[in-house]
Curated annotation (Swiss-Prot):
Domain of life of the source: Bacteria
Alphabetized Pfam families for the sequence: Ribosomal_L10
A molecular function GO annotation: large ribosomal subunit rRNA binding
Protein name in the entry: Large ribosomal subunit protein uL10
Organism: Nitrosomonas eutropha (strain DSM 101675 / C91 / Nm57)
Keyword line: Ribonucleoprotein, Ribosomal protein, RNA-binding, rRNA-binding
Length: 171
């Protein structure tokens, strides 16, 4: 598909805007996947807040220049799809789960905060719990001592009432 110069500039600008707000980029080769499969992935990515698109590598190379993701430029070879997201774990997790179900979708590389990752590193990132899971674990850990203290304080009057009830039952 041929683009005129204005369309090319618009695509590069759109990708640059997404990259400016991104915390992570995952690159995957999609050779041999059907349109239906890619559409399913696009829907899931959109629901997760991930910008997922098949873009010409030259457009993305121009968009990542002078960004923390510029190290990815050498990995941009072949037919690639790009997942750009604000949460590195969710971005890696959504694309990795799709790759597990579809052998023809292969994660090639990724980047976050100036660090370029291999496909294996992206898989390891996908294995981490999400931000919400980590926050709920932290909240549970912080809440446990307080809850235990409250139960202990509540036990003293309860024990007294049970003792009075036992005395009343004897009489």
């Amino acid at each position: 598909m041929s683009h005129n110069l204005e369309e090319k500039k618009a695509i590069v600008a759109e990708v640059s805007d997404q990259i400016a707000e991104a915390q992570a980029i995952v690159i995957a080769e999609y050779r041999g996947l059907g349109v239906g499969q890619l559409t399913q992935l696009r829907v899931k990515a959109r629901e997760s807040g991930i910008y997922f698109r098949v873009i010409k590598n030259t457009f993305v190379r121009r968009a990542v220049v002078d960004t923390p993701f510029s190290g990815l430029a050498e990995s941009m070879v072949g037919p690639l799809a790009y997942g750009i997201g604000s949460d590195p774990v969710i971005t890696a997790k959504v694309l990795h789960e799709f790759a597990k179900d579809n052998d023809r979708f292969v994660i090639k590389a990724g980047a976050m905060a100036g660090t370029v990752m291999s496909g294996k590193d992206v898989a390891a990132l996908a294995a981490l719990p999400s931000r919400e899971e980590l926050l709920s674990r932290l909240l549970g850990t912080l809440q446990a001592p307080v809850a235990k203290f409250v139960r202990t304080l509540n036990e003293v009057p309860s024990k007294f009432v049970r003792g009075l009830a036992a005395v009343c039952d004897k009489k």
